[in-house]
Amino acid sequence: MLGCFFFFFIQYKVQVEIFVFKVHYLREDTPFPKMVVDVDALANEAIGLLDQCKDDNYRVCILIVGPPGSGKSTVAQDLSRQINHRFDEYRLQGNQKSAHGGTRSRASDVALASDVPEITTPLSEELAFNGGILPKYVEDVNFQPVKRRLENGDLQILGRGGLPNAFTISNDVEPDEESSFAQIVPMDGFHLSRQCLSSFQNPQEAHKRRGSPPTFDSNNFAQLCKTLAQTCTIKPGSCDAKSCFEFMAKTYDPHFPCIKIPGFDHSLKDPTPDQFCLNGHTRIVILEGLYLLYDKENWQRVHEILQNTGSLLVWYIDIEDHVIEERVAKRHFNSGLADSVEQGRLKFQGNDLLNARLIRKNLVQSGKVVTLRND
């Protein structure tokens, strides 16, 4: 009886805090409603969405978007940490060491990436001959991602960036108790590799402007979002749970498809394959990056694809240029990309600032985007 009261109180507390969160937007003359970053409130909102969608959506997605130096990565990390802490606390209160895995989802009814064509023999040969990249297509934003079956049975999806930016889908999944309830998927794993940039018609400019829209495998990132959207709309099993977390634990599906996604190694300055693994444990996916609301080429599809799932939250972090300039200049200096803070400022002005202004001028227009302040 005491346990039931505790779960009811937590659920009630979350709903009340979500209401308080919603009425504290800063009403200003901007394209989107504004509010100050409050990680606890953001976690409430994310869990509230999951609770609202739980009968029809196995998982939900969150987009955190902002210019370089806006703190989007930190916000995403703090948010995932807060959500995972709350779920772990729930499991401890219920004396649960692992999720139940009691009822199966409808995942077996969904063929992920079924619309992606098989790789052709000539393309496969070109991939092998060029060390895993496709030099002829590295600048082709209209390149159609392709798939191939690996020896272990996994399905690999690759775009114009080739193997460095590929993601894989596995249906033969061993239960992994270490996976997180909320996971971050940074856009960084879709930076075109330096080998790809060297294959551009103007490789010097490509390396100089690394981080600009043409230097990402936007083709395959959009395809990843389509695949994630499919997993969002998979219907979970049914149960009589009274709280959101209880429902998630009881409907955990250990056989849910696993998606392995590339990350980015800053020491190697290149993407790293299979850095992130989203499996049946992952019920909240936090995508963060600069171009997730960019209303041009493949990026413009990201918001629409995920919005159509009915299980999406979008937060755009806005901040003045002079603030992000200082932050990024110091970051360039501290990471060894610039010999001084002043040189870091010049690097920022010649690349990062251009990208930030490009995004502001070309934001997806949606009444469901909330702007955050992170000064």
From Swiss-Prot:
Keyword terms of this UniProt record: ATP-binding, Kinase, Nucleotide-binding, Transferase
Domain of life: Eukaryota
Entry EC number(s): 2.7.1.-
Residues that hold ATP according to the record: 66-74
Annotated InterPro entries: P-loop_NTPase
Listed GO MF terms: ATP binding; kinase activity
Function, in words: ATP-dependent kinase that could be involved in endoplasmic reticulum membrane assembly.
PANTHER family cross-referenced by the UniProt entry: URIDINE KINASE
Family affiliation: Belongs to the YFH7 family.
Protein name listed in UniProt: ATP-dependent kinase YFH7
Species this chain originates from: Zygosaccharomyces rouxii (strain ATCC 2623 / CBS 732 / NBRC 1130 / NCYC 568 / NRRL Y-229)
